[in-house]
């Protein structure tokens, strides 16, 4: 059974990792500080992924699997990879990849309850393959609770930069803003956001458009939840986690003032985990804000509630346990 083989391989890989960790501790090599500790962690995770990706599964061109008792994965594969090439050659992919594809299909089908959008089942966001799921609720709650700028009180306009699933645009619509633009440059994210906005009945309030960051027009409120960690993503889903050279963060700050209406605000939603991992300092962030001609009006903080923040066995627990997610209210200086 392929799944049992994968589970056995996971146990073996994790057992070897624990053995190496214990051996290093006995040799006095465990006291590695950040950011080196984080880089070693990513290296270990990459090695683990490479080993777990070594179990391969054959596919026919129509996405059927020529193995006994193989499941029907046509719908899941079509969502992730596009329509099958019926007359094409047989292909091979890793079991880990296909498990991810099937898992993404289930998330897309069931959806994720977002309390900020009301009561289930009418509050569900359906993430697509390769689009980050809104499983961390604290940043969504910050957007729900932050006081809207006065400029938004009458026919206010808002932009959700890098909308992903469209969840933050939907929260803004839930707050009765009626002129919202949700932008992204990833075709999967655009399709995903469009589906969710229509499914929630918010199509008249929210327009989904393709843009690198900002749309052509100005707005009274511009929200951005960029990837939180400086680093190079190694997969599509990691683009929601890692921001190479803090490129998106810097670009948002640099262009914000020019795209705000008078009296408007920019809301930057950002975790300080990068600071605890020593990948970025608070002084650097404040310097980028000042350099962009912006000022900080206020900051709202929320403690993460996800499992890793409380898991003492996590390799980065000492940093994760101190993490705080903040909504920075910014305005032109």
Regions found by a protein language model. Name each.
Residues 1-113:
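N-terminal auxiliary segments of SAM/dcSAM-dependent transferases
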Residues 74-171, 320-322:
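SAM-dependent Rossmann-like transferase core, predominantly class I methyltransferases
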Residues 136-224, 230-231:
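Conserved SAM/SAH cofactor-binding pocket of Class I
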Residues 187-189, 226-251:
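Mobile active-site "lid"/loop adjacent to the S-adenosyl-L-methionine
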Residues 249-262:
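A short glycine-rich, Lys/Arg-flanked "PGG" loop and its adjoining helix->strand segment in the class I
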Residues 263-270:
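Conserved beta-strand signature within the Rossmann-like core of class I S-adenosyl-L-methionine
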Residues 274-292:
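Short, electropositive alpha-helical surface patch
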Residues 286-332:
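Class I S-adenosyl-L-methionine
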